[in-house]
């Protein structure tokens, strides 16, 4: 159902509205480091977020999928969007950059999803990349799930390995939920 709904959404416009909501948040203003996914076509556009993080002097880290089929990724600090090239699954990933062992305390993590429910259960693409990321890197700073309002459902199924989000950690084009 979420995949069908996504096809009718203008992810560029939704991403632009989310970006404006994000830039008004204290979590954005206070973060010295931002971890952000590089959006795919069917996700809210994060280009302006990546550009602003770099322009404002924030340390910007993006994910790079590791070889193999175990759903792992690493954090890579980039200094330019020119550092990105299509990688695994056709997703833009860093072709160089410095691998980061852990996010510093207070770093802001921006996480994608296919959908989320009102209790914070996140539906991803099924490979567990971001659940492993959140568990492995022990996010100590704020985290926000970027999800279009149309894809916030009353309830979704959860697995025991799913990392939950709490109220106040879901950002839509209408603000924080």
List where the protein language model places each region.
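N-terminal active-site beta-alpha-beta segment that forms phosphate/nucleotide-binding
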Residues: 1-104
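Short, well-ordered strand-loop elements centered on a beta-strand within folded domains, enriched
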Residues: 70-77, 121-123, 174-177
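Surface-exposed, charge/polar-rich loops and edge strands
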Residues: 4, 95, 104-109, 117-121, ...
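Short glycine-rich anion-binding loops that position phosphate/pyrophosphate groups of nucleotides
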Residues: 40-42, 114-118
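Glycine-rich, N-terminal phosphate-binding loop of Rossmann-like dinucleotide-binding domains
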Residues: 38, 113, 172
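Receiver (REC) domain switch-region micro-motif
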Residues: 34, 109-110
């Amino acid at each position: 159902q979420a995949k069908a709904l996504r096809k009718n959404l203008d992810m560029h416009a939704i991403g632009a509205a989310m970006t404006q909501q994000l830039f008004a948040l204290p979590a954005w203003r206070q973060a010295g480091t931002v971890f952000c996914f590089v959006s795919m076509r069917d996700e809210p556009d994060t280009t302006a977020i990546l550009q602003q993080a770099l322009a404002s002097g924030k340390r910007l880290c993006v994910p790079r999928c590791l070889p193999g089929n175990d759903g792992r990724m690493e954090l890579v600090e980039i200094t330019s969007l020119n550092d990105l090239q299509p990688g695994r699954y056709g997703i833009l990933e860093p072709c160089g950059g410095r691998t980061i062992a852990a996010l510093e305390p207070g770093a802001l993590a921006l996480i994608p999803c296919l959908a989320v429910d009102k209790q914070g259960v996140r539906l991803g693409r099924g490979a567990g990349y971001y659940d492993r990321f959140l568990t492995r890197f022990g996010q100590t700073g704020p985290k926000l799930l970027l999800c279009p309002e149309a894809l916030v459902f009353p309830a979704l199924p959860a697995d025991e390995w799913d990392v939950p989000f709490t109220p106040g950690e879901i950002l839509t084009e209408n603000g924080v939920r």
